[in-house]
């Protein structure tokens, strides 16, 4: 029988519940348990796919094509289990499901209410998500409840968790509450009152936390922990100090040293073997003792909110770990390049243009790509970054003046990137789309395996085929591929069914690669990722070459 750990948050949002949940999962996995994680989001959107990055941050795409919360990216980076659509659901999905049942008559004419119908549906979704992992043999499912205790939106989820723990009985559910202990500089002290009130609010609805994770910008002294313990009715050894660190990969060791996993295992009636966190210790050691460093320029339009590129930033960190180098990421606003030019790129060891949507800032990205191509700077283009690399090459090398994407200019004289109106989904069904189709359901999403052209850089990186995740509506237009290849571009991977370009490269350049997929979603600190490791090695070589020429 699967046991559950519910992770809640108090005082303020963005405290790092996802990191805390993933870190606990990593410790339990190191103790030999089969663990999965779920994220419950209280917003009414069906999924975050059409939400602004400024509102929600990154949209993480799972292997089965679900557009999910960025916390699922943390989950995959911390444990070995792969996340799926069932690992993340929202209030919108719950209500959508309940309303469908009501229309079908499943409730036999009863008045449909939040309790019991909505809360029962939440419990069914949670159980289904837990059973989907490990062929139904999940030992522990850690369930992160989004939002903050006291929010109206979170109440049905908290009530469902309370009911679930009651129904399952003793030693089958535990609660971990993450809260803020702010430091007031003018008073020179930490304040525990917000945490006390947060726990009181939780207890009012019938939830009594087994563990309190107290987040602060410094270690919380024992006397303050004792005060929190007394007023919150949580044992002192379960009041855990969680202070700011320079790497999220230090959190598992921090929690383990304070006995969090032992408290949770005791609450769940589990006696697994001791934890082995040597892998995490080695990762942290590699992070703290790099042998070299590189500076990567990430050119985008969401640079003021780096959460929009969370998986990508982490993938570069992973590549640094596996090349024993410190990767410094410099976020550059593409609109700034449009006004100030490319001189601000001269100090960079490599340039990267990530995925994105919309016309704003695209000419700045194209200027950065041209700078990388003409100056031999290693370049990696992801999704939109590949499409813009094709546009830049078409304009300035292949002689296709005015080349563009129909996303930005529907009347472009040379639409080298266009909306593909018909394609086959992962199940082999033919789907059609056009400019009037709903944004939430018209993208190519999820993992797809593609053969790689022999003798290419792509083959030296990936081998004979590549299996990566997608999230895009537009594709490189096959009509123009012969003209591009005649000018020196190589299409190094194509989809097996539609023959759509998946990877491009420039053999005449030291390292210039574009990919239509999102490799950042499959990078982990344990294994890194071959594409990003190759890219960072190229950046190190470029840096060394520039130093020789200086």
Swiss-Prot record:
**Chain residues that bind UTP:** 13, 191-196, 227
Q: Mind listing the UniProt keywords for this protein, alphabetically?
A: ATP-binding, Glutamine amidotransferase, Ligase, Magnesium, Metal-binding, Nucleotide-binding, Pyrimidine biosynthesis
Q: Which PANTHER family match?
A: CTP SYNTHASE (PTHR11550), CTP SYNTHASE-RELATED (PTHR11550:SF0)
Family in the record: Belongs to the CTP synthase family.
Record the organism: Bordetella pertussis (strain Tohama I / ATCC BAA-589 / NCTC 13251)
Q: InterPro entries annotated for this entry?
A: Class_I_gatase-like, CTP_synthase, CTP_synthase_N, GATASE, GATase1_CTP_Synthase, P-loop_NTPase
Can you tell me which residues bind L-glutamine? 356, 384-387, 407, 473
Example of a GO cellular component annotation carried by this entry? cytosol
Which molecular-function annotation in GO is an example for this chain? metal ion binding
The reaction(s) this protein catalyses: UTP + L-glutamine + ATP + H2O = CTP + L-glutamate + ADP + phosphate + 2 H(+); L-glutamine + H2O = L-glutamate + NH4(+); UTP + NH4(+) + ATP = CTP + ADP + phosphate + 2 H(+)
Which EC main class describes this enzyme?
ligase
Summary of the function given for this chain in its UniProt record: Catalyzes the ATP-dependent amination of UTP to CTP with either L-glutamine or ammonia as the source of nitrogen. Regulates intracellular CTP levels through interactions with the four ribonucleotide triphosphates.
Keyword DNA repair listed: no
The pathway that the record names for this protein is: Pyrimidine metabolism; CTP biosynthesis via de novo pathway; CTP from UDP: step 2/2
At the highest ranks, the source species' classification is: Bacteria, Pseudomonadati, Pseudomonadota, Betaproteobacteria, Burkholderiales
**Can you tell me which residues bind CTP?**
13, 151-153, 191-196, 227
The record's active-site residues are 383, 518, 520
What name does this protein carry?
CTP synthase
**Region span, Amidoligase domain:** 1-270
- Positions of ATP binding: 14-19, 71
């Amino acid at each position: 029988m699967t046991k559950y750990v519910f992770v809640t948050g108090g005082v303020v949002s963005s405290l790092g519940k996802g990191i805390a949940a993933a870190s606990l999962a990593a410790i339990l996995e190191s103790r030999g348990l089969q663990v999965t994680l779920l994220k419950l989001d209280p917003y009414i959107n069906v999924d975050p796919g059409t939400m602004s990055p400024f509102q929600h941050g990154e949209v993480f795409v799972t292997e089965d094509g679900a557009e999910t919360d960025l916390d699922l990216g943390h989950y995959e980076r911390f444990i070995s289990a792969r996340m799926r659509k069932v690992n993340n659901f929202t209030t919108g999905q719950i209500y959508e499901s309940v309303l469908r049942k009501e229309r079908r008559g499943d409730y036999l004419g009863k008045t449909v209410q939040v309790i019991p119908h909505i809360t029962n549906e939440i419990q069914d979704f949670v159980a289904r998500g837990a059973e989907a992992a490990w062929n139904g043999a999940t030992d522990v499912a850690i369930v992160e409840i989004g939002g903050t205790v006291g929010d109206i939106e979170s109440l049905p989820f908290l009530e469902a968790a309370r009911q679930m723990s009651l129904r399952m009985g003793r030693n089958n559910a535990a609660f971990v509450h993450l809260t803020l202990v702010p430091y007031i500089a003018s008073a020179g002290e930490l304040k525990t009152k917000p945490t006390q009130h947060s726990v009181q609010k939780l207890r009012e609805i019938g939830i009594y936390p087994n563990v309190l994770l107290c987040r602060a910008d410094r270690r919380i002294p024992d006397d303050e922990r004792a005060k929190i313990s007394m007023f919150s009715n949580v044992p002192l050894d379960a009041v855990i100090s969680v202070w700011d660190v320079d790497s999220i990969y230090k959190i598992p060791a921090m929690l383990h040293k304070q006995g969090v996993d032992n408290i949770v295992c005791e609450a769940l009636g589990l006696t697994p073997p001791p934890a082995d966190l040597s892998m995490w210790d080695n990762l942290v050691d590699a992070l703290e003792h790099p042998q070299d460093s590189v500076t990567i320029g990430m050119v985008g339009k969401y640079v003021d909110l780096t959460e929009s590129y969370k998986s990508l930033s982490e993938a570069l960190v992973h590549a640094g770990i596996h090349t024993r180098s410190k990767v410094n990421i410099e976020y550059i606003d593409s609109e700034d390049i449009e006004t100030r030019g490319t001189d601000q790129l001269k100090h960079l060891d490599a340039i990267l243009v990530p995925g994105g949507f919309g016309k704003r800032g695209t000419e700045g990205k194209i200027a950065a790509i041209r700078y990388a191509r003409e100056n031999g700077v290693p370049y990696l283009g992801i999704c939109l970054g590949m499409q813009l690399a094709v546009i830049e090459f078409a304009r300035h090398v292949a002689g296709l003046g005015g080349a563009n994407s129909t996303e930005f200019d529907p009347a472009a004289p040379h639409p080298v990137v266009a909306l593909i109106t018909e394609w086959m989904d992962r199940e082999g069904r033919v789907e059609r789309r056009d400019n009037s189709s709903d944004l939430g359901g018209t993208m190519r999403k999820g993992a797809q395996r593609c053969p790689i052209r022999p003798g290419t850089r792509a083959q030296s990186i990936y081998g004979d085929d590549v299996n990566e995740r997608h999230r895009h509506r537009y594709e490189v237009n096959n009509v123009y591929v012969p003209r591009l290849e005649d000018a020196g571009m190589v299409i190094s991977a194509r989809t097996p069914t539609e023959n759509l370009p998946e990877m491009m490269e420039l053999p005449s350049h030291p390292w210039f690669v574009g990919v239509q997929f999102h490799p950042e979603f499959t990078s982990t600190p344990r294994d890194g990722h071959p594409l990003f490791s190759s890219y960072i090695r190229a950046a190190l070589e470029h840096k060394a070459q520039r130093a020789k020429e200086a």
